[in-house]
């Protein structure tokens, strides 16, 4: 009886720890898409509960209607963006031409320090510049009200 009680208590403790141990991170908990001026932007959010843990943004530009001069201007903009994002320790930036399209990808972890840095640099627009975390629900609501399609 004593062994069964101990096993039952151990099981209850493990269940309690699992329940209190925090929520699992969900990859692609929400995805927002916007098409504007020939650019398709997609933002995917990883989240733990309502807290965004990572933002992945992909922007795709179809270059088929662009002149050589316009492509050079785009490339200069990409060079500037590469320099800007390279200065940020935890943020990943890449931009490549694939099948006649320019594909830009930015990955931003939203830990407090990185979030503060990208907000200070003006690379992530938020209502409160002293933000320490992002709410998935509020972020999705704001994007939807700005015309983004939410999945």
Where are the regions that the model predicts?
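Positively charged n-region of N-terminal signal peptides that target proteins for export
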Residues: 1-4, 8-9
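Subset-of-secretome marker
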Residues: 23-151
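C-terminal motif of bacterial Sec signal peptides marking the signal peptidase cleavage site
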Residues: 15-19
């Amino acid at each position: 009886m004593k062994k069964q009680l101990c096993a039952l208590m151990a099981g209850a403790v493990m269940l309690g720890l699992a329940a209190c141990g925090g929520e699992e991170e969900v990859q692609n908990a929400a995805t927002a898409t916007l098409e504007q001026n020939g650019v398709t932007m997609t933002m995917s959010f990883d989240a733990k509960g309502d807290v965004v843990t990572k933002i992945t943004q992909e922007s795709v530009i179809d270059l088929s209607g662009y002149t050589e001069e316009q492509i050079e201007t785009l490339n200069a903009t990409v060079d500037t963006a590469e320099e800007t994002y390279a200065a940020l320790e935890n943020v990943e930036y890449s931009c490549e031409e694939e099948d006649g399209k320019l594909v830009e990808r930015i990955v931003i972890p939203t830990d407090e320090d990185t979030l503060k840095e990208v907000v200070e640099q003006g690379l992530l627009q938020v209502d409160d510049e002293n933000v320490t975390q992002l709410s998935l629900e509020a972020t999705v609501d704001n994007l939807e009200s700005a015309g983004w399609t939410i999945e």
